[in-house]
Amino acid sequence: MNLEEEMQVKWEEKKRELEEEVHIALVGQPGAGKSSLINKLIGRKLFETGVHTDTTVDMQEAAYGTLRIHDLPGYGTARFPVERWVEEFHPEQYDLYLFVFEGKLHDSDAILFTFLKQWRDEREHPFFIVRNKKDQIWDEEKPKDALMDEIAKDVRDKLDEPDAAVQFVSCRTSEGIEDLKQAIFAADVLGVKRSKLRAEFQATSMEDLAYKKQHSMKAVNTYAWLGAANAVNPVPGLDVTLDVGMFYKLLSEIRRIFGITDDLAQTLEKYKVLAPIGQRVFSYATQEGVVMMVKKLAGEFAGKEISKYIPFVGQAAAAATGYMMIQKIGEKYVDDCYTIAQEILRGILKR
């Protein structure tokens, strides 16, 4: 295999890693708050709440970054007994499952559990049993802990797993959401998918943000390599080749991962310390802004940075310069977004 072939193999490998998606299936009882739960975990309104999927026969889908969320319709009905439901929607293909319920479990739930265990054991696709609306668990004659123990025992009996974990959460109060997040992050999800889960879920701690920064730095390296290797046209007037569209996509992805949305631009202007950072971040929010920034900084990188590290000439040097530019500017962009996200989490910025 010659150098060109090796580069092509590497390019395809990095592209597959970049494009790999994580598929999450929402299953369980209608009205249990599946939509509210995934909205809470991600921190975005991906699904309308209060829509009961037992009255429909279609799957609802939403995308957020590399996450693909599949809200499956009800099962155990005359039209969709569990086995027929499995044949129709092929849920075995998804990476992980959130089984959400709020009332008593039914025989159809127990049948579904046998499939969930099969997919976990044979395909390494984990599932999580989530009892939503924890704040509404109440009985004047029994303490809440005793009621929760009874619910957990019922789940374990139907699942036939005495040590199975049951996650109790409340989307209204956020109670239990952090524990569920950590359980998902610790799940046996193979390869880069685990990293993407942590990157896309809403950050609720400084530890989450630190992980997002680490993930974003790796993404910068991947995009830098792809952006330089894939570039076929030089930036007009410069001795640099890079894929501007891919560079723009990288910066957009970094903002999304850190939860920095367009509506923050005006808010950031009110804070003296953060205003310059915000201006930098949002000045690169369009492809035109990216091109202007590349033109502004290309001379510095071509003249100083690249000569130290890359002994190339001609087109190879131009591509290598593009790589270094994406790498260095991308890392700085991550730092800026990380700083803003930290302040958001600390509550300094009020939306």
Residue map of PLM features:
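Switch II of P-loop NTPase G domains
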Residues: 54, 70-118
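Alpha-helical membrane association modules
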Residues: 199-351
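Flexible, charged surface loops at secondary-structure boundaries
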Residues: 18-19, 62-64, 89-95, 160
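Canonical P-loop GTPase G-domain recognition
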Residues: 133-199
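Conserved G1/Walker A P-loop phosphate-binding module
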Residues: 1-77, 260-261
